[in-house]
Amino acid sequence: VCAYIIGLPVPEDYFSSLKACSDSLTTGCFVSWRTYRKDSEAPQFIADEKFKAVVINPLTWTNETSLVSASLNKGGVLKNFNHVVPKVVSAQIHNNILWSSKPNVPGKIFYTQKNFHIGDINLFYINIRENAEARIKAFLKNQL
């Protein structure tokens, strides 16, 4: 249906028969992103990569590079997965990474990290769940 290869760089030509998803309902494809705070530069090891990584924005499920408002973020979850925070971050593709705004959570003033890898799934949790369900339905519909 779809491989969610989240938090890892995937070169555009890495798979011979699996391509990056082009929209929210494409099947037989993959999505990937690595999340960093907006306006931060990626670490040197990313800058040194000799390939263009696939980056799909989990708020639009495309590779368009425009800023996508947090209003499209249906909800992220905190580390205990016991509370959904709607509109938790915006997102924008930038130079082989996904930029996001600082999470809109209690205590965000103390959140100084630039690398949001720990939140690659949490920040977009509801969007990912709903997308997986939509892709499964699209896949099954195409099987008939």
Where are the predicted features?
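Surface cap/lid and interfacial helix-loop subdomains adjacent to catalytic sites
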Residues: 1-134, 138, 142
